[in-house]
Amino acid sequence: MIKPEESRFAAGTIFFLLFPTPDRRPGLTFRYGEHLSMRIAFAGTPDFAAAALKALIAAGHTITLVLTQPDRPSGRGMKLKPSPVKAVALEHGLIVLTPLALRGPKAGDEGEAALKALEESESYVFVVAAYGLILPERALNAARGVGEDGSIKSINIHASLLPRWRGAAPINRAIEAMDKETGVDLMKMDIGLDTGDVICSAPVAITEDHDAAQLTEELTQVGARLIVTALEHPETLTHRPQLENGVTYAKKLLKTESPIVWTQDARQVAARIRAFSPFPGSTTVRNGETVKIWFAKAVEGSGQPGEILAVGDAVVIACGTGAVACTRLQRAGKPAMDAKPFAQSLQLKIGEVLV
């Protein structure tokens, strides 16, 4: 039996210490010395989810159905572009459905057809990763179920250690809050917002070298490994309720959060810059021109908030307390640059004040 609290190890690694017996249920094929292959339905949209889908395919599982969000306009030409999950699904010849919604007035016939397809897919488990659409209870209960008690019908791959950072932007909010650790949880889904029982966890340390893009990539790989490892022996999985203490919510990122508040403590300013890289970005204004800062670390220094204290390998800017060393910056309409060529292009001078 796998106990979730025994499955946490450092560096995003999870170990399952068990000796399984063959599962002879219809739809499952046990192969001694290899993985247990079964029928899996999948829902997800971004790269975080696409990596998990690739890993499940590589592990030999049969993907019965893929749900992902509709194609979106992208690039300067605003041409419709499929989601990363759809691209993977099409590459492997999988059935892909892209309903606008699965419940509510927007669901319509397309949403109903997707739910019916999910129910008729004869899947043993429904794996969800950053899908982006609200799933009705009907979808959560569509699969047959795995686990010791057979009750795990849908599994969510969530990029935090629950109950901390339930919601839409757990990676960004963890960096913004200066957390020292985050990770990936596999969660038995229920109708609440990331409130389901935890199946297993893989913690990952957060350092000052992580921005949101880098941490997302790391957690993406951890999540892909975690779901494959868990489903090697699905009949042994257990689950436990989330702790009642320590619940926090990772609210959706907004473009209105971009402006840097230089009166804040330098550690907070630097954390927000890294948390909002690449989206929504962190901006300041110099002589009426908007400047985006992509990466920064807190350093010692004092001056008027927003004042440039040094220019070189980093542009050092004073905050309410301390200063931040900015090493990657960008002018509007221009590519991002390292600090030194950026400062030269704008002829930045010590003593200037950014707002």
Where are these regions (language model features)?
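Generic beta-strand hydrophobic packing signal
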Residues: 4, 66-67, 296, 329
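Hydrophobic residues within membrane-embedded alpha helices
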Residues: 4-7, 20
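One-carbon transfer enzymes
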Residues: 8, 12-13, 27-278, 331-333, ...
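Hydrophobic alpha-helical signal peptides and transmembrane signal-/tail-anchor segments
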Residues: 14-20
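An anion-binding loop in the catalytic cleft
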Residues: 257, 263-355
